[in-house]
Swiss-Prot record:
One Pfam family matching this protein: F-box
UniProt KW Repeat keyword: yes
Sequence segments annotated as region (Disordered): 1-33
Kelch repeat intervals: 139-192, 193-243, 245-286, 288-321
Protein name in UniProt: F-box/kelch-repeat protein At4g39753
């Protein structure tokens, strides 16, 4: 019932905004006046049960809705009612902006359009810049240890703050500060400790990495990597391979840290256009000419059927693969005018893939949707992605 009301309200808001007053049209039902007159706490209760995909349209229904949608109280209500959703965020460096920009993937809810023809013409998803009515705040970098969740800011100015909360509680509280201020650091949990790296000024290079022990509530510096191993750009992510930290950068090199020997070294870049991701208990590999899955029974990679059209679309320019609500989310770019030698802009494209293992053991993939989500200058740089539940 609440979702039906959301669709009606969003449709009314779109119609009133998109058509001139002089044009005769069929009147769409407006949101019930009684609902708008309710106390804020009851409106929040309703909004918290509606998928966030409706929020951009609902925010133009009234000022009350707009203020409540961007409020922290709505996040608390969604946590209380267990209606939180997963959201995919990307961080891009655009040539005309001095600081990195965060975007959130907005996915159109089913039944959002009235006409079937409009569904086919309009995009299923798009990247929306943060902040917006869809994502009011820059996403936090979140890691968990036992029953506690720790978070770091991914924005400017640099901050020493680390937050912590119990998984059953929505309220964040301050944890012991890091030893230096960091902007967009990266964090990883190993041996029940939190390793934090990057994001600090050159003058703070002695504290480029540090580790937090929740038992003692103290920070300790990591050994200082040599200058060539301290990246000039934002660290993309950390991967644990055979007991070592592989620090993936957006520079021409990566680095590796051995926590046992406490030593840094140069790491080889992963194979180009071979992006691997785990969905459930299965590993998938996206390569220039094929999609593969790893069969644990025979310990070998096998071809995924049904994705030949997508193979042609993203055979080059693959940016990222992530697990998203039990499916595989792909991000890639391509020139807006591929036949030209020099192209000023690129399309960033996204696709959602579901998988089905059949009786013969063969895995088939299905493209749930695929479209262009953003147009950017060709000189842009992809910095990082994250999936957050909120």
């Amino acid at each position: 019932m609440v979702t039906f009301w959301a669709e009606t309200a969003a449709s009314a808001a779109t119609t009133s905004k998109g058509e001139p007053p002089s044009k005769k049209r069929k009147t769409n039902p407006s949101p019930p006046p009684s609902l708008l007159s309710l106390p804020d706490v009851l409106i929040l209760n309703c909004l918290s049960r509606i998928p966030k995909s409706y929020y951009p349209k609902l925010s133009i229904v009234s000022k009350t809705f707009r203020d409540l949608i961007i409020s922290i109280d709505l996040n608390h209500a969604r946590f209380h009612h267990k209606t939180q959703e997963h959201f995919f965020h990307v961080c891009l460096k655009l040539p005309d902006r001095p600081l990195p920009s965060w975007y959130t993937l907005w996915i159109k809810p089913q039944g959002f359009d009235d006409k079937e023809e409009e569904k086919k013409k309009k995009k299923k998803s798009t990247l929306v810049q943060v902040p917006s009515s869809y994502a009011s705040q820059t996403p936090l970098l979140v890691v968990g240890i036992d029953s506690d969740v720790y978070a770091f800011k991914q924005c400017y100015p640099p901050s020493r703050v680390m937050f912590v909360r119990n998984k059953e509680c929505v309220i964040w509280r301050n944890a012991p500060d890091m030893t230096v201020a960091r902007a967009n650091p990266v964090a990883y949990v190993f041996d029940r400790k939190i390793y934090v790296m990057g994001g600090c000024a050159e003058t703070e290079s002695a504290n480029w990495g540090e580790v937090f022990d929740p038992k003692t509530q103290t920070w300790e510096p990591l050994p200082v990597p040599s200058p060539e191993l301290r990246f000039s750009s934002m660290i993309r992510k950390i991967e644990m391979i055979q007991g070592k930290f592989y620090v993936r950068s957006n520079d021409s090199k990566d680095s590796v840290y051995d926590p046992i020997r406490e030593k840094w070294n140069v790491a080889a870049k992963p194979q180009l256009n071979d992006s691997r991701c785990s969905v459930g208990n299965v590993w998938y590999s996206c390569r220039p000419n094929s999609f593969l899955w790893f069969d644990n029974e025979i310990k070998n990679w096998r071809l995924i059927k049904g994705l030949s059209s997508l193979n042609h679309s993203c055979r080059s320019g693959l940016i990222e693969t992530v697990c998203y609500d039990g499916n595989l989310l792909l991000l890639w770019d391509k020139p807006t005018k591929p036949r030209r030698r020099v192209c000023e802009d690129k399309y960033i494209c996204c696709a959602l893939i579901s998988f089905n293992k059949r009786k013969n053991g063969q895995v088939w993939g299905k493209v749930e949707w695929s479209n262009v989500v953003l147009t950017v200058p060709s000189s842009y740089r992809f910095l990082r992605s994250t999936v957050i539940r909120t």
